[in-house]
Amino acid sequence: MPQKKSRKIRKALVTGGAKGYGLGITQALVQAGYQVWITGRDTKALNRAASKLGATAIQADVTSTADWDRVFAVIDQAPGKFEVLVNNAGAGIHIAPAVEQSDADMDLALAVNLNGALYGCRRAAPRIVMAGGGTIVNISSVCARQAWAGWSTYSAAKAGLEQFAKCLYLEHREQGLRVTSLAPSWGATEFGAAAKLDKQAAAVRKKSIQPAELGKIVADICALPSHLFVQEMVLWPSIQPVEPL
């Protein structure tokens, strides 16, 4: 009787994986067959999401390099090849005119929305190369290319992240690393409330980007043939008025 081939174990990490877009991304990657680790600061939410979706939770702060090292030390101990990093963690911090933001507000906004993802990319890239190839998906924002008053620091962080992604891809293109910037707009997540923005009407929220929808897009990007990659994708809900595009 022929022996069954052992199933290839593909490892993935999703930051901010317990809520909002991260929850949808985690679910989609688990369904696609990945062994998924999720990180975040809310231990209860992490454990709840991990139990529900079949992922592994690690409490960690993306702004801490020590936490990043600890997370990858855990992942490295597990069998399989590390193929996917989704830098999803982010926050609005203090959405207000630049002169009304404190230096601490700006520092934190850049730490959460830019530096944290850079720390992750620096650690994930060599592991993905060693695995023979894979994908980093950075969840950016339409704010990287669309200007709105009050979003200056957040926009600067996301624009910087997108340019970093392009350079990182060029540095490792021949080694099989793909780096995608995925920039969604209005979403049915907790982002608005956390940023202390006006709450979306239920009808608008229903027609905004759903976590499961973004999750499917991320999984599809990761499933592309190895000779193809998505450099960047901008995702708008049609209910959102944008002029000019």
Annotated model-derived regions:
Residues 146, 167-177:
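Active-site-adjacent segment of SDR/Rossmann-fold oxidoreductases
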Residues 96-98, 102-110:
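Substrate-binding pocket helix/loop in short-chain dehydrogenase/reductase
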Residues 141:
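Residue(s) in the substrate-gating loop at a strand-loop-helix junction
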Residues 121, 157:
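Active-site helix of classical SDR
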Residues 60-71, 103:
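The beta1-alpha1 cofactor-binding region of Rossmann-like NAD(H)/NADP(H)-dependent oxidoreductases
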Residues 174-177, 181-182, 201-243:
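C-terminal helical subdomain
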Residues 18-20:
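Conserved glycine-rich cofactor-binding loop
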